[in-house]
């Protein structure tokens, strides 16, 4: 199937990699695949899919929303018994069932319009993967790997890095895609930890982060003054400057603050 015969859908965030050499380079970052079950989200025209299959993967499961691509993936399935393509919206898929077989790796050029939503959906199960090699819009990738005291440091940075080691592998120009997006893209290597870096109640942690980063230029004292009256003593007990802003706090400090707030049964509103 030629790209000229296929009309991409902007609503699906479709930006296809057409050069097999680029696809092979991205797949190479995942390392050996011979004994692995691999997940690919948004296989599109199957260029990356073929590169993964060339690595003698144990099992490759792709999830594709666009049923117009079924002919391509039916042919790949006929040629490779280890391949299967599920035509469904990944956001509607039972993630626990999808990730039931180990060991697991994930390699994907993620649709831009769902990349963050999908990553957050995967986080509760992220420990099941040995490694994820994912293509994001560069701005999103920068947020994932960002450190404190940087413009890109955000809730996304914190939630992902609490559970994983992250590394930006390479930036790619718009020209490698069809259609070409208006921005650069980046490949991120995500290596899940065996356990979180710090112990914290995930649901409560998310509430605290949302409160602190809602107005990121506010001091943490001002951000939490509606929730707790003697906040300064609590901050000092956590070795945190009450005049600091959320964007300057490390993940360890944020977890310590969250645990202290929870210990006092503070309702975050």
Curated annotation (Swiss-Prot):
One Pfam family from the record: RrnaAD
Enzyme class: transferase
Keywords, in A-Z order: Cytoplasm, Methyltransferase, RNA-binding, rRNA processing, S-adenosyl-L-methionine, Transferase
Entry EC no(s): 2.1.1.182
Superkingdom of this protein's organism: Bacteria
Signal sequence interval, chain numbering: none
Recorded catalytic activity of this chain's protein: adenosine(1518)/adenosine(1519) in 16S rRNA + 4 S-adenosyl-L-methionine = N(6)-dimethyladenosine(1518)/N(6)-dimethyladenosine(1519) in 16S rRNA + 4 S-adenosyl-L-homocysteine + 4 H(+)
CDD domains reported in the protein's UniProt record: AdoMet_MTases
Amino-acid positions noted as binding S-adenosyl-L-methionine in the UniProt annotation, renumbered to this chain: 17, 42, 64, 89, 109
Subcellular location per the Swiss-Prot or TrEMBL entry: Cytoplasm
Residue stretches in coiled coil: none
A GO CC term attached to the entry: cytoplasm
The protein's name: Ribosomal RNA small subunit methyltransferase A
Family: Belongs to the class I-like SAM-binding methyltransferase superfamily. rRNA adenine N(6)-methyltransferase family. RsmA subfamily.
Function: Specifically dimethylates two adjacent adenosines (A1518 and A1519) in the loop of a conserved hairpin near the 3'-end of 16S rRNA in the 30S particle. May play a critical role in biogenesis of 30S subunits.
InterPro entries: KsgA/Erm, rRNA_Ade_diMease-like_C, rRNA_Ade_Mease_Trfase_CS, rRNA_Ade_methylase_Trfase_N, rRNA_adenine_dimethylase, SAM-dependent_MTases_sf
Species for this entry: Anaplasma phagocytophilum (strain HZ)
GO molecular function: 16S rRNA (adenine(1518)-N(6)/adenine(1519)-N(6))-dimethyltransferase activity; RNA binding
């Amino acid at each position: 199937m030629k790209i000229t015969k296929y009309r991409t859908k902007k609503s699906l965030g479709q930006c296809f990699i057409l050069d097999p050499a680029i696809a092979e380079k991205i797949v190479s970052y995942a390392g050996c695949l011979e004994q692995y079950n691999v997940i690919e989200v948004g296989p599109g025209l199957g260029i990356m899919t073929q590169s993964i299959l060339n690595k003698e993967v144990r099992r490759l499961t792709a999830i594709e929303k666009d049923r117009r691509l079924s002919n391509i993936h039916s042919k790949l399935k006929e040629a490779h018994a280890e391949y299967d393509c599920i035509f469904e919206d990944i956001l509607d898929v039972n993630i626990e069932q999808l990730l039931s077989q180990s060991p697991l790796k994930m390699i994907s050029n993620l649709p831009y319009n769902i990349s963050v939503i999908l990553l957050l959906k995967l986080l509760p199960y992220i420990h099941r993967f040995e490694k994820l090699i994912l293509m994001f819009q560069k701005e999103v990738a920068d947020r994932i790997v960002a450190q404190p005291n940087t413009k890109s440091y955000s809730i996304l940075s914190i939630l992902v890095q609490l559970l994983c080691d992250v590394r930006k592998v390479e930036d790619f120009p718009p020209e490698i895609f069809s259609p070409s997006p208006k921005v650069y893209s980046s490949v991120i290597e995500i290596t899940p930890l065996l356990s979180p870096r710090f112990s914290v109640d995930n649901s409560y942690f998310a509430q605290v982060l949302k409160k602190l980063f809602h107005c990121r230029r506010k001091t943490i004292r001002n951000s939490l003054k509606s929730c707790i009256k003697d906040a300064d003593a609590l901050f000092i007990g956590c070795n945190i400057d009450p005049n600091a802003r959320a964007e300057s706090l490390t993940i360890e400090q944020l977890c310590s603050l969250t645990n202290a707030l929870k210990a006092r049964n503070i309702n975050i509103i």
